[in-house]
A protein has these predicted regions:
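A short, N-terminal "cap"/entry segment at the start of jelly-roll beta-barrel domains
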Residues: 1-40, 69, 89-143, 226-230
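Short acidic-glycine-tyrosine-enriched beta hairpin
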Residues: 63-81, 180-196
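Ligand-binding loop in jelly-roll beta-barrel domains
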Residues: 78-103, 142, 186-187, 195-222
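A mid-sequence, solvent-exposed acidic-amphipathic segment
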Residues: 130-163
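Short histidine-centered beta-strand/loop micro-motifs
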Residues: 38-44, 85-86, 155-161, 202-204
Length: 230
């Protein structure tokens, strides 16, 4: 659930693995804290979806440059080299990587490099839940969808998805319930949900919305959920 090994530290940045790669999944998740200068993102065979947790800076891919701020996301395709430059203060970025074995969705729109969560359209999910799709087939990410989800107090019924997913929680409290386990969701918690894994995601607050960041493959709609027996 939480990082359980020491970070790799150099003079400019710290990298922590949050959800490690496994043999039967195309997804992995890590966190970068940029302290000074620049961070280079380059994955020869894996697409990268970035999300800014805190701080500000800029991202450059070849001749394209865009500003980064808290709540913005970026797409770096396999083989591209992106340069992240630090603004004021530390810059904390999540990096989800997607391997070439992931099925590719047909593109549904032109590629974007950086998007802001406030500019993404809001859509309804199960019950009163909603989400904003940051990246997906609509803007260049054909192997995975990256979204921010909004969970009101309470819980959804037992359900599952057909996609493989990693979820990161910026702020709790909450719980993820599986048929045979229950885990607390606190700030910085990250976990994996396998295809068809029956679960409940609960917001334990009485009066505050819980926010989550999710990435899944194959790309599609976060609203695609299927009810399971109680």
């Amino acid at each position: 659930m939480r990082p359980n090994y020491d970070p790799r530290v150099d003079q400019a940045s710290t990298t922590i693995g949050l959800v490690s790669a496994v043999s039967d999944s195309a997804l992995a998740l890590s966190s970068h804290r940029v302290r000074r200068d620049t961070l280079t993102i380059h994955e020869p065979q894996r697409d990268s979806l970035l999300y800014v947790v805190s701080g500000a800076g800029s991202l450059t891919i070849e001749a394209t440059s865009a500003n980064l701020a808290e709540g913005s996301a970026a797409l770096v395709l396999a083989g591209e080299q992106a340069r992240v430059e630090l603004g004021a203060g530390d810059l904390v970025i999540l990096q989800a990587t997607i391997g070439p074995e992931a099925d590719r969705h047909a593109p549904l729109g032109p590629r974007e490099v950086v998007v802001d969560v406030d500019a993404a359209s809001a859509s309804q999910a199960t019950g009163a839940r909603s989400f904003r799709a940051l990246f997906g087939p609509h803007n260049g990410s054909t192997r995975a969808t990256l979204f921010v989800g909004y969970v009101p107090p309470g819980r959804a019924p037992w359900h599952y998805h057909l996609y493989d997913e990693i979820v990161w929680i910026p702020k709790g409290p909450g719980r993820v319930l599986r048929r045979d386990s229950e885990d607390a969701l606190e700030a910085g918690t990250a976990f994996r949900l396998r295809p068809r894994e029956v679960h409940i995601l609960e917001n334990s607050s009485r009066d505050r919305e819980m926010v989550l960041l999710g990435v899944f493959t194959p790309a599609g709609s976060p609203a695609a959920a299927y009810l399971a027996e109680e």
